[in-house]
């Protein structure tokens, strides 16, 4: 299985590093995985495929439109596939970008009205994700998706087999939409829990925060609240892994995360990405992985 959408900050490239740091119990006893910031779901979908002892999954995101897609994939995969295939058929008949533009912007307007049923809203979400510029999901302050059309000749909107496989695997999943702390009310009593936390990254430059994934900002105060949440997880006896940007990439004296997570293990790993829009100035960057090692 693979993520059904493109997602900025997706964790496919970090999966190897995450796997290396998983606690031993995930390979030997039944457990629950909790993702309070599920996003594109790369970690959860990998775990559902590759960790047979995963017995329950709890996923959450503050982006209600995204969570609706997960709910529809879980409950109505065939209807969703049919709706997207219909969008695909109409889009493919439009032979060039200029002819595709009116269709794209009409569907974007329909999505932003949010008056369609859940299946259609989910289908439009995936359509826009696959046809908009660079797979970005960005909304303005009024929660209006505002990414322009991308220059794709023949994008594929839906992988039927992948959606059906994900749907089967999501049947024992609790799907939530709201604040990240919401997940604590939905933990099982009979399994140990592993939390993977992938919050909106703290910007490492003034231009790095170009993307808004929801209409809720995630500033330094939110990062501090998340650190307190991690302390709460630790006191409850659960294991957590958290990923974030490393401020030291651009300011070697920035101790923000080192101070925030001083009670836990902080590791710096090389990310599979670069910073600077100038190709001559691109350089590899580090990310941090924080864990508690319960």
UniProtKB/Swiss-Prot annotation:
Its EC number is 2.1.1.72. GO terms for biological process: DNA restriction-modification system; methylation; mismatch repair. Gene3D superfamilies: Adenine-specific Methyltransferase, Domain 2, Vaccinia Virus protein VP39. S-adenosyl-L-methionine binds at residues 7, 11, 61, 198. InterPro entries: Ade_MeTrfase_dom_2, M_m6A_EcoRV, MeTrfase_D12, SAM-dependent_MTases_sf. GO terms for molecular function: S-adenosyl-L-methionine binding; sequence-specific DNA binding; site-specific DNA-methyltransferase (adenine-specific) activity. It catalyses: a 2'-deoxyadenosine in DNA + S-adenosyl-L-methionine = an N(6)-methyl-2'-deoxyadenosine in DNA + S-adenosyl-L-homocysteine + H(+). This seems to be a stronger methylase than M2.MboI. PANTHER family: DNA ADENINE METHYLASE (PTHR30481:SF3). Belongs to the N(4)/N(6)-methyltransferase family. This is Type II methyltransferase M1.MboI. It comes from Moraxella bovis. The lineage of its organism: Bacteria, Pseudomonadati, Pseudomonadota, Gammaproteobacteria, Moraxellales. The gene is mboIAM.
């Amino acid at each position: 299985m693979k993520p059904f959408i493109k997602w900025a900050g997706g964790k496919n490239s970090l999966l190897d590093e995450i796997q290396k740091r998983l606690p031993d119990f995930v390979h030997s006893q039944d457990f629950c995985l909790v993702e309070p910031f599920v996003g594109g779901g790369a970690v959860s979908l990998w775990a559902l495929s590759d960790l047979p002892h995963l017995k329950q999954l709890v996923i959450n995101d503050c982006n209600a439109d995204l969570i609706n897609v997960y709910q529809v994939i879980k409950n109505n995969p065939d209807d969703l596939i049919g709706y997207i295939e219909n969008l695909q058929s109409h889009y493919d008949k439009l032979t060039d970008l200029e002819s595709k533009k009116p269709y794209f912007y009409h569907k974007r307007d329909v999505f932003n009205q949010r008056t369609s049923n859940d299946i259609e809203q989910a289908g439009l979400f995936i359509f826009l994700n696959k046809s908009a510029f660079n797979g970005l999901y960005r909304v303005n302050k009024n929660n209006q998706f505002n990414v322009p059309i991308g220059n794709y000749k023949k994008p594929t909107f839906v992988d039927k087999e992948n959606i059906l496989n994900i749907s089967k695997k999501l049947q024992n999943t609790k799907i939530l939409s709201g604040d990240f702390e919401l997940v604590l009310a939905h933990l099982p009593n009979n399994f140990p829990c592993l939390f993977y936390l992938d919050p909106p990254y703290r910007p490492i430059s003034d231009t790095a925060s170009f993307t808004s994934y929801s209409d809720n900002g995630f500033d330094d105060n939110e990062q501090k609240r998340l650190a307190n949440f991690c302390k709460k997880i630790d006191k409850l006896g659960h294991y957590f892994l958290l990923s974030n940007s490393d401020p030291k990439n651009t300011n070697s004296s920035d101790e923000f995360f080192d101070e925030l997570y001083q009670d836990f293990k902080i590791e710096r790993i090389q990310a599979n990405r670069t910073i600077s829009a100038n190709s001559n100035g691109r350089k590899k960057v580090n990310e941090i992985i924080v864990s508690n090692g319960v």
